[in-house]
Amino acid sequence: MPILGLAPELYPTKPAHFDIEKVIRPNILALHPYRCARDDYSEGILLDANENALGHSIPSASSSALEPELQPTLSLDLHRYPSPTHDPIKQRLAELRGVSGPESIFLGVGSDEVLDLLIRVCVAPGTEKILITPPTYGMYSVCAQVNDVGVVKVPLELSGDAGEGGERGRFSLRVDEVKKAISEDPSIKLIFLCSPGNPTGTLIPLSSIREILEYEDFKGIVIVDEAYIDFADEEASAVSLLKDYANLCVTQTLSKSFGLAAIRLGIAFAHPSLIQILMNTKAPYNISTPTAALAQSALSPDAVALMKQKVSTLVASRASLLRGLEALAPLGLGPAIGGNTANFVMVPVLAKDGSGAPDNVRAGKIYKTLAESEGVVVRFRGNEAGCAGCLRITIGSEDENKVVLQKFSELLKAL
């Protein structure tokens, strides 16, 4: 069954063992997407969408009720539904990330909408599954449960004794175990890989991703979540593989390196066939006009240059924070574990008896005291696989990092 809205002859697919029409749920393939006149006509006297022709009702700039900083937003056409496609944003993203064009890009309300939509279009409730590699981002399992699909777990390398990736191989992807799980369970439709990992901070080598993409027993799609990719080396992104693999989808966001978490803009880069399916299935007008305006500005050459400058500053701060945390080793703070390619670090709190064992109870006390008494909120990750006793610390400003180190020193002595 052809994908509505796609000219397949323009977009050949490979590898040979992949057929997207066998991955997408039949009811989604047959879906006739919601369409409106605005899809075809966006100028002139617009009387097609039952909008308020008199405009919004927020008081004018002369009113004391108006916050001055809202004026740029209020000057937008807020009484009109936003663009269904946002091609100018996609074009800037295509140029930034080196993909073919807007036809290879989907925009969602944060990456979470993208992840949820991928599950909904590919995985049949009650009968089919996704595969995840703990410890990893928690929303994969949440989306799976919401959509009533199964979850197969293949933990990352937890011993730290072998494999590529983080410290001494810790949190490496166990490719052979992933392939084994695929071969044993053909109901697995999607594989979610987080690179750099959350909470691990570890990159998955492109060679490992390629090995799974080329594994003929797997007929589904590999999703590489790259929320933190700008904090890693430029050549680390799996976007470079898209031209060769129609069974790959790479997700990114403006929340991390771009510093725009509040606008909720997530991105999927994939073969045009999958992008068209997502476009056919998404809610109409999912990206708001204010979000689109801010995203367009954030992707300008000057803004991208500033983003890269701030990323460089954060990377330097990450190194400084790590040195400060290492100095706390005599107080019972273990060396950072995992990789060093995100805007956070993860450190284990060790038992006070000097045994060197990670201590979840002590870590929990420090976490809670930091938040409730010291005004410093970090993330307790001690219940994740391979993360016993661990606290995840986002890289803050220089002043914030100094406070974190001081408070950690005080609490490690006291607790």
What kind of feature is each model-predicted range?
Residues 262, 341-342, 385-389:
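Short acidic/glycine-enriched loop/turn segments that link adjacent beta-strands
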Residues 247-330, 336-337:
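PLP-dependent aminotransferase class I/II
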Residues 2-85, 173, 187:
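N-terminal "arm"/small-domain region of PLP-dependent enzymes with the aminotransferase-like
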Residues 207, 359, 372-373, 383-415:
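PLP-dependent enzyme catalytic core of the Aspartate aminotransferase-like
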Residues 251, 335-340, 380-383:
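Short beta-strand
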Residues 76-217, 228-245, 249:
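Conserved core of the PLP fold type I
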Residues 315, 328-373, 395-397:
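Conserved PLP-binding catalytic core of the aspartate aminotransferase-like
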